[in-house]
Amino acid sequence: MTKQQNQAEALSVRQIPFAEAEYEQALKLRDEVLRRPLGMSIADDDLSGDADALHIGAFARSGAGDAHAERLVGTLLLRALDGRTLQMKQVAVEKARRGTGTGRDMVRFAEVRAAELGYGEIVLHARENAVPFYEKLEYIREGERFEEIGIPHYRMRRELG
């Protein structure tokens, strides 16, 4: 699928329920995008915190079909660190959708939802190659580079509101 075809598909972003079909699709996408390229499996991850997280999904649909024709093309989750701060984790967009605004739309949706819930900031650990993406979205890099799951990361933060 080309970027032009991807841009022709309608994109909707919404919160998805834990432990239902959309969550299972999100797990599969997280595995394909974030774990398999590193020779890892999401089955080896500690997913116990997922039950308390806020899950966001981006869904593509071409034409005027019904919701059942939608497919998950991006996902992320937010975990509360305290009453003011959420950590954004597991941001994954299918390869064919990168560069089409899918990631940006998910992050912006997550920020609005976080603010609605009374949170004042989002923090994240960005893979080194994703830092420019987050900087465009006004996230500030903090501290030195560190390794997580064997690859370089930076801590980033954005104040909401």
Place the predicted regions along the sequence by residue:
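Conserved catalytic-core motifs of GNAT/GCN5-like acyltransferases
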Residues: V123-H125, E135, I140-R157
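Conserved acetyl-CoA-binding loop-helix of GNAT-fold acetyltransferases
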Residues: V93, G99-V112
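A short beta-loop-alpha structural element at the N-terminal edge
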Residues: A10-A26
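Conserved beta-strand in the GNAT
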Residues: G57, D66-A80, Q87-A92
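Active-site rim helix/loop that mediates acceptor-substrate recognition in acyltransferases
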Residues: K28-A67
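A conserved beta-turn-beta hairpin within the catalytic core of GNAT-like acetyltransferases
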Residues: A80-K89, R98, E148-G150
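Conserved GNAT acetyl-CoA-binding A-motif
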Residues: V107, A114-R127
